[in-house]
Curated annotation (Swiss-Prot):
Protein name (database record): Proteasome assembly chaperone 1
GO cellular component, one term: endoplasmic reticulum
Keyword set, alphabetical order: Chaperone, Cytoplasm, Endoplasmic reticulum
Chief location bin: cytoplasm
Subcellular localization(s) per the UniProt record: Cytoplasm; Endoplasmic reticulum
Organism annotation: Danio rerio
Lineage, broadest ranks: Eukaryota, Metazoa, Chordata, Craniata, Vertebrata
UniProt record, GO biological process: chaperone-mediated protein complex assembly; proteasome core complex assembly
Family from the record: Belongs to the PSMG1 family.
Amino acid sequence: MATFFGEVLSVYSRAVEEDEYEDMTNENEEDEQIRREIEEKRSVEVCWLLGSQDGPLQCSDLIIGAGPNASGFIRAYLLSTVGWTAVAWLSFWNERSRGSERPTVVPGPGEPSCVLYRLESCPTVLICQCQGFVAEDQLFQFTEKVFSCVQTRDLNVTILSDCSSADYKTSDYLSGSSTPFLRCLKTSTYTHTVTCPPLEQPNICSGLAAAVLSHCQVHQISAVLYQCYSDVLHPDSASMQMFAATLSSVLKLEQSLSADVLQRVTRVSEIQSNLYT
């Protein structure tokens, strides 16, 4: 075929085209297999501790604690008292988990975990204590799994979370004496009285707390998020005590009983955060 000088012609070779197609097919199959393995490894599963569970648990109030101070408060003020039974736990793995595989046995005390507890004297009150890091790509699935454990009809959800005061945006000077403090966000269906001012713009919530609140808003579940802003990196008693008033309408807290446990929780955290110990 005649052409002008310097023109580049595409030369078609059926053998070359077929080889490239086979290579691309093999690569796609390998990529797909790797993707499935990663998804399986990072999936979230509910493990029941009650034997065979036919359906979701009856629940009127669900308390979810996410973050060091929130989970520490639940441990000191609630789980330290008698009458709570572990009913389920969530098995998941990510880059911050210990080991290289998703756990198959319930984590021991002090290990990263997410456990669902039920109050024996009032079985419709449940607590979800999350002491492990949930990756961003796991938040949606994690939230779906938590709410699959409970009946959502006439459900009230209280979310406890904590955040660094350095992330709080305000036009006024934020002194150390003004921390810790609480701010709240609620869904449109939440009609109960809140115990602190609402979170001002342009502040936002993120992580597991935001995922749970968004899920409740979409599914029209009554929910409120209480976020504690603190200038201390590890759990401390002052920050934990900020959550006490948020549960006054749901549970009666034993202040004197939790004092010793509260000291143990903060003491362990201080030892772990000390680089010179």
